[in-house]
C-alpha cells in the first residue's frame, strides 16, 4: 500500500470518485505508514484516535456511495502543528506549548 501513498492527489481523488479505492482502505494505508515511520520522524505530534479516523473514513465512503461527496472526500488530511486544531494539542514546535490543547 505504500505505493498507493505515492500517487498524485488527482489520481487518488479519481480512484475514490470511481469507487476503485475506498476511503477506509486509504485511511488504513495512511495510518499504517504513520505507524511505520513516525517513531523516527515525529512528523505527527498529535493525532485523533485511530477508531475515530476510521469511522470518519466510513462516513466519507457512505457519502461517496450516495454521490454526495465533497471535493476532497475521503482524503486524509494532516494539519501543521503551527495551526490550532480543535481537540488536538498544538505545540507550535515548542516544548513550552506541550500541553496546549485548543
What are these regions (language model features)?
Residues 6, 63-65, 83:
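Hydrophobic transmembrane alpha-helix bundles
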Residues 1-55:
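An N-terminal boundary/leader segment
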Residues 56-61, 84:
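Glycine-rich loop at the start of a catalytic domain that most often binds anionic cofactors/ligands
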Residues 73-102:
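Enzymes and membrane/adaptor proteins characterized by extended Gly/Ser/Thr/Asp/Glu-rich
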Residues 60-76:
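Immediate post-signal peptide segment of exported/extracytoplasmic ligand-binding proteins
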Residues 36-41, 67, 84-90:
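Secretory-pathway/luminal and periplasmic proteins that interact with or process carbohydrate-rich
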Residues 48-49, 70, 93-94:
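Alpha-helix initiation/capping motif
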